[in-house]
């Protein structure tokens, strides 16, 4: 249903209502993004969007790396709830309209960060907290230890969504492709994205093909 302000209200099974403004313009920039104050990781929200029979999941092509496949996800901004952010990303990147059935939890994108200063700050905080020593003066911290202590690039809260319909016109329709995939197809497509794959594994997608 629509409210007077144009927001779309979706009734979810737990009787929570999530208002989503389906604008035709994607949000850009990071001025409103949320960040973990300790790790510096960007806080994100995303959807594992399933077909009504739960046999397929909707993947979208990455805007930065082709022909890589991902699920709709992006920054959780300061003026919205995490559920609103997840559904907004589903709309902007995949043109999907649906309802949240449950939270899948928070998952860390542990691919190496390209922000060296953030890495050093995180390591310094960890070492100071654990031993009272400044990491910059601790000569025992080797390359392997540093690798293990790398801060996550992002921390994403994923939600399982049942897709009600896919719109032909949506904000990123010229930037991305979208494709329904079976569990096995999606598993192969997401081999380089362990965070997304872990969220898929926790979803209710049917894993056995008849």
Curated annotation (Swiss-Prot):
Reactions catalysed: diphospho-myo-inositol polyphosphate + H2O = myo-inositol polyphosphate + phosphate; P(1),P(6)-bis(5'-adenosyl) hexaphosphate + H2O = adenosine 5'-tetraphosphate + ADP + 2 H(+); P(1),P(5)-bis(5'-adenosyl) pentaphosphate + H2O = ADP + ATP + 2 H(+)
Record-listed E.C. numbers: 3.6.1.52, 3.6.1.-
Keyword Magnesium: yes
pH note: Optimum pH is 7.6.
InterPro entries (alphabetical): DDP-like_NUDIX (IPR047198), NUDIX_hydrolase-like_dom_sf (IPR015797), NUDIX_hydrolase_CS (IPR020084), NUDIX_hydrolase_dom (IPR000086)
Binding-site residues for P(1),P(5)-bis(5'-adenosyl) pentaphosphate, renumbered to this chain: 42, 62, 73, 109, 176, 193, 195
Domain Nudix hydrolase span(s) in chain numbering: 40-203
Motif Nudix box per record, residues: 74-95
Presence of the UniProt keyword ATP-binding in the record: no
Biological process, per Gene Ontology: adenosine 5'-(hexahydrogen pentaphosphate) catabolic process; diadenosine hexaphosphate catabolic process; diadenosine pentaphosphate catabolic process; diadenosine polyphosphate metabolic process; diphosphoinositol polyphosphate metabolic process; inositol phosphate catabolic process; intracellular phosphate ion homeostasis
GO annotation, cellular component aspect: cytoplasm; cytosol; nucleus
Positions contributing to 5-diphospho-1D-myo-inositol 1,2,3,4,6-pentakisphosphate binding: 42, 62, 73, 111, 176, 193
Molecular function GO labels: bis(5'-adenosyl)-hexaphosphatase activity; bis(5'-adenosyl)-pentaphosphatase activity; bis(5'-nucleosyl)-tetraphosphatase activity; diphosphoinositol-polyphosphate diphosphatase activity; endopolyphosphatase activity; inositol phosphate phosphatase activity; inositol-1,5-bisdiphosphate-2,3,4,6-tetrakisphosphate 1-diphosphatase activity; inositol-1,5-bisdiphosphate-2,3,4,6-tetrakisphosphate 5-diphosphatase activity
Function in brief: Cleaves a beta-phosphate from the diphosphate groups in PP-InsP5 (diphosphoinositol pentakisphosphate) and [PP]2-InsP4 (bisdiphosphoinositol tetrakisphosphate). Also catalyzes the hydrolysis of dinucleoside oligophosphates, with Ap6A and Ap5A being the preferred substrates. The major reaction products are ADP and p4a from Ap6A and ADP and ATP from Ap5A.
Similarity annotation: Belongs to the Nudix hydrolase family. DIPP subfamily.
Subunit structure: Monomer.
Protein name (Swiss-Prot/TrEMBL): Diphosphoinositol polyphosphate phosphohydrolase aps1
Highest classification ranks of the organism: Eukaryota, Fungi, Dikarya, Ascomycota, Taphrinomycotina
Gene: aps1
